[in-house]
Amino acid sequence: MTDRNLAALLVARLTGTADHPRFTGAPIDLSTLDAHTLGAAWPALRRAEYEIMLRDHAYDDPRAEFARWLRGQIDALGLVPLVDADAALELFRDMPPGGWKRALEDLPCLDALPSPALQAELARIAGEPEDGEIRAKSAYGAYALDWFAGRRDFSARRDAYAQALADSPFRVRELDVLPELGPAALLALAASSDGYFAPKRLWIDASDPAVTLAEDAAYVAFAHDTLTEAARQVAALHAGAVPYEADRAFTIDDAQVVARAARVAAYRDEAWLRPLIGPLLTGVCVAPTAAKTAPSQSLAIALGHAVETIPTPESVRALRDALATVRHAGVQKKLARNLKPAERALGERPHTALRMTLDAKPDKKQLAMLATCMEAGFWQPMTLGHAEWRERLVDAPAGAAFSARMIWQARGSDGATQSFMPDITKGKVVLRDAAGNACEIAEDSDIRLWHPLLVDADERLAWQRAIVGRSLRQPVRQAFREYYVPTDDDASVSDSTMFEGHVLSSRPLLGVARREGWSIRAYDDGLVREFGDVRATFLVDARLYPGSQSHGTSRRLHVERRHERRWVPSPIGEIDPVVFSEVARAVDLLVSVAAFALDDDATRAAAAALTTDPVRQRDIETERWQRLNRLSDLPLGVMARHRKHVLSLVFAEPVAQGKITIDERHVRVGAWSVHCATGRVTRDGEPVDATIEPPPSPLRAVPWLPYDEALLQRIVDVVADLLD
């Protein structure tokens, strides 16, 4: 079928009438559908969506049903229409005067600048204010429509909006730069939520105009002037040159402009932002007096969102400094939520993140932030040349402390790989393999963090023994990192059943999900997280919302890849194996925490606090034991199997002496057994509460663990106590 015939068929289905309301017609093959063919049918589709589906709510109309089906196929294919001049004229003639929202949605689909006839239609649409009145927040849409309508005299628009925004000087100054912007920048601002922005952690798939604005020279210059002036005003406030009034330094509208300027500068990693962001963020968080107020809550929160979304080493450090000094409880709580996501997002800008090692002291906080950033290199493409690896990591103070405890993999120009760890002693660097032997790598090698999935079982075990033998605690779990391989059935589809069927408690699920960077899906039935250009959606049969206390069964894990500005389902087999492994590991963590309750005093105390009724407390305790009994009979998951492997290495000597045995699910010491997945303790098959006493003296040997995990630590403590 030709493109012209396919477009005609789509238009016929969207506009024709049927003899029966359940008419569906012959299936249509969309395998040849492209952007231009879709553009030819776009006016008919939009007409069906607005005039039939929205206005008449015609759920029994075949045209509406076909429009829903076609929209779903378009989204699945990731297609964006390209509308030519004739179709564009038809498209915009359907729009009523004042229909700004609809016009702004379709303007990005034009394949060329508007013709004079189309400009006249756009002028007609823009001639009446949206919703019948001038609204300050609609300025971006008005300017965009005027630009595409061929109007270049914005003076009347500017005067009307300046009057409405008289209390927000930064918004008024932004009006003066709007006529200098190109069409892409204007559309990006118009497509935003009236200029307001929040990170994806709060609004799923909210577009940030800063990315487009960063390519527009006029807005970049405006961003520099805006941040410089904002910093000057804050400095004057703290110097006493301006009287202090709590929360009056910047209006809510101005806060959005200043924060957007910060995101533009951060996206470009402008050098002039580095000395500005610290004093600005701290200055709007802390009153110049001893009061527990803030000069501007709105700007403090907006800058926190900016740092979380597009971080730089300097802005993350500024966020830490602000958290250490802020006295306003509400602002402190908001900014604290930005810190972990900011560190994680900084890892997705690896070359920007590594700047922190050049001038930073190797303190614990700096090392923790570097570790968080570098861990993102497992799912974000990150390789360094040999010279850059030496400069940014091995030879830098903060970088050396990190790199000397991590395993690295070098790939030469011939494709050969070599894994090694740097041994840094008195400034001398020797590269050593898993056996401890010195090795050499070529100067033209590319270096990345070693991942257990990239090597065979013998090499994994060799590095694990090396880490245990040196009692080395790695900043990022690496040698003992869990890895996941999709099944053959999953490789050809975009969803996996790997974690399906677990009963999850929503409260711990949402707690760990938020900490790890997941967001609640728009339909409240799943969690979403991005891993570079891969997006994972983990579905749960429960309504998820902050504070929910329900239970639900886990469903499938869906993966998508970014296609321009859309997400398109991708076969798992086409995703980088390490990236999928990291996605699965993140989901396994959710399942492990929400399905396997840690059987400790804190958990029991929290459950007991829910009621003072002795009968109810007894029921809670019985339910807890029944749940642990059920979980103890399940096959071990990947994390539990990994935990069992670590236990075999940590207790290698008692195992060799016959004091401990480790079977499929349990660690056994005489009549006692401890389950590797739940920590459940039994004696001769009867469940017991194992009381772990503190070490009687500092001389008591405490088993060393290669990484931190609460349940693993509990199992080790119980087993060590039983051995004594």
Where are these regions (language model features)?
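Non-catalytic terminal/accessory regions
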Residues: 1-311, 316, 323-724
